[in-house]
């Protein structure tokens, strides 16, 4: 398997504004599930970050298929933890290459990427300046145990069936982010969900936030945002998603003490 740090990351920056001296803030995006490839595309919204000195990076980790079908297979079922390890490896590589520094990286992911964010903040909290968990699939074990949820049975092929298979139960309990929250300090977190989300039900981000609030030992900001009119894909309408991005970017910028 190619090392993710050498084969699977895209980095965006404004060359005339950023030196590779480790001082730049970074926003690192990850997904890593279902064989979905996150193509490097142009986004006008990212310019707001780049103009403020950020480096924006995409981690093409296992669970996706950027490097082929096997890359996907190596990030599902019993190989799922490869996805989390790859993401942390990519971050460490970008630090080693002096695009940024440990503790100066904000991270963002949605849905299965939100699960990744939960795992990453537990595995390597010292790396992150802030964490944005969008509609996060953080309570993997309990969701896969509830076959009344409409999407649970079709998802067993991706995560395993803990109802019928003790091996799958033990696997999900070992890595499910919700099950692994411990008493310690965590970076600032923005946790969002949609009340009408049929894929990641609103109580997953709510349970995550409640357990974090009762467990963590720091005073860092922990914000939960539930959109009462949204489903899995957040705000709709012409400007709804722009509003969401604006709020998420403000949270990220303030975590880096950038106020303009």
Predicted region positions:
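Short hydrophobic segments within beta-strands
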Residues: 13, 29-30, 108, 192
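Short beta-strand element of the alpha/beta-hydrolase
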Residues: 21-32
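Active-site-proximal cap/loop segments of hydrolase catalytic domains
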Residues: 58-260
């Amino acid at each position: 398997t190619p090392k993710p740090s050498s084969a699977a990351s895209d980095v965006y920056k404004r060359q005339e504004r950023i030196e590779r001296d480790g001082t730049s803030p970074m926003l690192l995006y990850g997904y890593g599930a279902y064989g979905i490839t996150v193509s490097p595309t142009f986004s006008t919204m990212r310019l707001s970050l780049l103009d403020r000195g950020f480096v924006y990076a995409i981690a093409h980790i296992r669970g996706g298929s950027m490097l082929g079908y096997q890359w996907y297979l190596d990030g599902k079922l019993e190989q799922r933890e490869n996805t989390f390890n790859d993401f942390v490896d990519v971050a460490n590589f970008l630090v080693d290459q002096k695009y940024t520094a440990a503790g100066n990286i904000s991270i963002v992911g949605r849905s299965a990427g939100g699960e990744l964010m939960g795992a990453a903040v537990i595995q390597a909290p010292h790396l992150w300046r802030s964490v944005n968990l969008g509609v996060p699939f953080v309570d993997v074990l309990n969701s896969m145990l509830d076959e009344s949820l409409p999407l649970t049975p079709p998802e067993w092929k991706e995560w395993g069936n803990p109802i019928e298979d003790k091996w799958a139960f033990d696997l999900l309990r070992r890595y499910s982010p919700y099950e692994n929250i411990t008493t310690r300090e965590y970076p600032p977190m923005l946790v969002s969900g949609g009340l009408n989300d049929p894929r990641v039900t609103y109580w997953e981000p709510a349970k995550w936030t409640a357990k974090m609030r009762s467990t963590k030992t720091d005073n860092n900001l922990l914000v939960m945002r539930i959109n009462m009119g949204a489903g899995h894909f957040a705000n709709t309408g012409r400007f709804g998603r722009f509003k969401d991005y604006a709020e998420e970017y403000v949270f990220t910028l303030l975590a880096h003490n950038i106020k303009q």
